[in-house]
Design a protein with these regions (language model features):
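Glycine-aromatic micro-motifs
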Residues: 1-160
Length: 160
């Protein structure tokens, strides 16, 4: 089976939310073949995109020195890529990019697929995520034991 590595830093970390989306679309659930906590260095998690479908700000990553984004490095089968692309809003809202991440064990993993908001859709100011949306991220950050200061940052974000 062909597989690929996917780094998710937003709501797609939440398997239940992802499963609900698949069910709503009539798709089989996306199977997480392997999951590791990973960090994307020199990037910052921000909310500068407004999602019409969620009616709130949603996550994006921006290059930012001395900052890190924590998320999940997930191994997926190639057949699930089409579902991830649709869920991510590719190519109209988010684009695919290959990044390098480090696992908590210190291993550098190169050529990992992630998604970033397309320039035309990025806003200049903070788009407030809903309490529900940010809870998806916080709950998984706690479950996977992200650093305390990162969870504190997530909790400090202004929501609607």
């Amino acid at each position: 089976m062909k597989t690929f590595n996917y780094f998710t830093y937003g709501s797609n970390m939440d398997k239940n939310d992802l499963d609900r989306w698949c069910q709503k679309k009539g798709y089989d659930e996306i199977k997480f073949l392997d999951v590791k906590v990973a960090v994307l260095e020199s990037f910052k998690l921000c909310f500068n995109y407004f999602s019409i479908s969620r009616n709130c700000g949603t996550s994006n990553i921006m290059e930012f020195k001395d900052s890190n984004v924590y998320g999940l490095l997930i191994k997926l089968s190639e057949k699930d890529k089409i579902k991830i692309r649709e869920k991510e809003g590719y190519p109209n809202y988010y684009f695919e990019t290959l990044i390098n991440v480090k696992t908590f064990e210190g291993n550098l993993i190169k050529g990992v697929l992630t998604y970033k908001v397309i320039k035309e859709k990025e806003k200049k100011d903070h788009q407030q995520p809903s309490k529900y949306y940010i809870s998806l991220i916080i709950n998984n950050a706690e479950e996977y034991e992200f650093p305390t200061e990162y969870i504190r940052y997530l909790r400090s974000l202004e929501t609607k």
